[in-house]
C-alpha cells in the first residue's frame, strides 16, 4: 500500500502531533476540527476495531476511552514506537491496508488521514479484502481527504500554489487523493452501502456498512 511513503512518515513522526493541532499553516485547514473528526470516527466504531495507520495513536486513544478492543496496523516504525509508548496495552503491528495479519474478524475497520496512500486500484483491492475480514454486519469508518470531483481537486491544488503552500500542493499532486464518485463505486461494487459527510474543506467521513446487515 503506498509503502513508498514510509520514510516520509518516519520523518514526520517527530512533528506530527504539532501539525494536527494547527501549528503548521500549510496543513491547518486539512486538520481543521481534527478532534471532532476523530470523535466522529470513534462514535461510529463498535466492537473489535482494526485501526489502519494509527500514526502517533490519537484515534487509538479515543477508541480506548470508549472501551473498544483495538489492534493497530502501522507501516511506519517511528510512528509505531510513538503510538506504542502512548498506549502500551494496545497491540500495534507492522502492516498496511493490503497486508495485515489479524486472526479474528473485525467489527469495524477504522482509519483517519491514511486511505489516500493507496491508488484507486489498491483501494478497490483493500475494500474487497475488508469484506472478507469483517464479521456479519461489520462496517468501515474512515476519514480522509477526498474531493467531490477531479476539477475540485485541481482547484485546491491551484489555490495551494497561489498561497505559497508548496508542500501541500506537492502532497495533493503526488499522493492518491480520489473523488467521492470513485469511492462510492468501489464500496458499492464490493457489497457496502456508504455515506459521506463533509468535515472540513478537505476531509470527508466515510461510513460504509455491509449490505444486508
Residue ranges of model-derived segments:
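A short glycine-rich, Lys/Arg-flanked "PGG" loop and its adjoining helix->strand segment in the class I
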Residues: 124-136
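A conserved beta-strand element that flanks and buttresses the S-adenosyl-L-methionine
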Residues: 110
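Class I SAM-dependent methyltransferase SAM/SAH-binding core
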Residues: 52-99
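Short catalytic micro-motifs in class I SAM-dependent methyltransferases
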Residues: 113-114
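Core SAM-dependent methyltransferase catalytic element
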Residues: 190-213
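Conserved acidic residues
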Residues: 47, 107
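C-terminal alpha-helical "lid/dimerization" subdomain adjacent to the S-adenosyl-L-methionine
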Residues: 143-190, 196-197
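Conserved class I S-adenosyl-L-methionine
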Residues: 1-44
